[in-house]
Amino acid sequence: MSKKKVMVGMSGGVDSSVAAAILLEQGYEVIGATMQIWPDTDEETKLVEGGCCSLSAVDDARSVANKLGIPYYVLNFKDIFEKSVINYFKDEYLKGRTPNPCIACNRFVKFESMLNKALSMGIDYIATGHYAIITYDDNKKRYLLKKSVTQQKDQTYALYNVTQEQLKHILMPIGNFTKEQVRAKAKELGLYVASKPDSQEICFVNDNDYGKFIEENTDKEIKPGYFVDTKGNILGKHRGIIHYTVGQRKGLGIALGKPMYVVRIDAENNTVVLGDENEVYSKELTAYDLNFISIDKLEEPMRVKAKIRYSAKEADAVIYPLEDGKVRVVFDTPQRAVTPGQSVVFYDGDIVVGGGIIQ
């Protein structure tokens, strides 16, 4: 019987390197690949060094592939990355929302474009170094996405968009490992990326300065406007709505004699609404662009744990189906800084139920 083939998305980091090594040990025919996402200009030097697809990432991934003795490719996904990740990121900020580009990249680049490329090459699976577990439920006849064994590293929040058809062709071999075990495994294999630090920032934004990135990469005018309170009274001037996000207190550039927080961003009127901290809390939200994994669709209210951003703790909530395919999420206790444009992900224990984008 011929070996099953798997293309591993290699970022040059320790997680994807060890994922490739584990699959080799498990008897797969492994092919390494790094996504080329930067334009053909000097722009590529602007990618965050050490980021998941920078030039040094390609060098690191190639040397790991050589060490493991596997073929290695660099795949060109520049156009889809620009359209589905960078342009989406800019457009959302210009609309006064706060997007999560890593979720868009997973959805449109890794698990759509890269998977389709692999399948077109006659490869059975793609694999990544994500901390998550994929299983198959014989009773439900569905693939399930579950949290990794290590809660601090769990990455299921950014993976909720994967479909049943995609899950059939995805492997995530390090979901049962802790970060320490992954680093130890890399060391044991003699991979020099064993001690490489994790990438933290958005790969195409230097110094995490989103506002500066958008100003430099849009032809739209970033207009200053007014800070207003929740009653509409003018409090002062802001530098442009792209510089603010819900819940923000620092860096507002306005002194009001007491701490004030961004409560809402009104793109239509180019205003940033400020309020006291208690005004930043919300008991409910509406989500759209839903994807469900453990169920086919939401037909009746369901009790879940809901997570409103990557760094947030899960909170008890009930989700209700709405007629237009959206979902209403009602929390047991008010949540701080529910932010339009971010994703909300629903859990049932360690199982990902699904998720959507906050309206």
Curated annotation (Swiss-Prot):
Major location (coarse): cytoplasm
Record region (Interaction with tRNA): 153-155, 309-310
Catalytic activity: S-sulfanyl-L-cysteinyl-[protein] + uridine(34) in tRNA + AH2 + ATP = 2-thiouridine(34) in tRNA + L-cysteinyl-[protein] + A + AMP + diphosphate + H(+)
Role this protein plays: Catalyzes the 2-thiolation of uridine at the wobble position (U34) of tRNA, leading to the formation of s(2)U34.
Enzyme class: transferase
Keyword terms: ATP-binding, Cytoplasm, Disulfide bond, Nucleotide-binding, RNA-binding, Transferase, tRNA processing, tRNA-binding
Domain of life, source organism: Bacteria
GO biological process, one term: tRNA wobble position uridine thiolation
Record has Transcription regulation as a keyword: no
Name used for this protein in its record: tRNA-specific 2-thiouridylase MnmA
Disulfide bonds: C105-C203
Keyword Disulfide bond applies: yes
UniProt cross-references to InterPro entries, sorted A to Z: MnmA-like (IPR004506), MnmA-like_C (IPR046885), MnmA-like_central (IPR046884), MnmA-like_central_sf (IPR023382), Rossmann-like_a/b/a_fold (IPR014729)
Localization in the cell: Cytoplasm
GO terms for MF: ATP binding; tRNA binding; tRNA-uridine 2-sulfurtransferase activity
Residues marked Interaction with tRNA (site): H130, Q342
Binding-site residues for ATP, renumbered to this chain: G9, M10, S11, G12, G13, V14, D15, S16, M35, G129
Alphabetical list of NCBIfam families matching this protein: PRK00143.1, trmU
EC number(s) on file: 2.8.1.13
Family statement: Belongs to the MnmA/TRMU family.
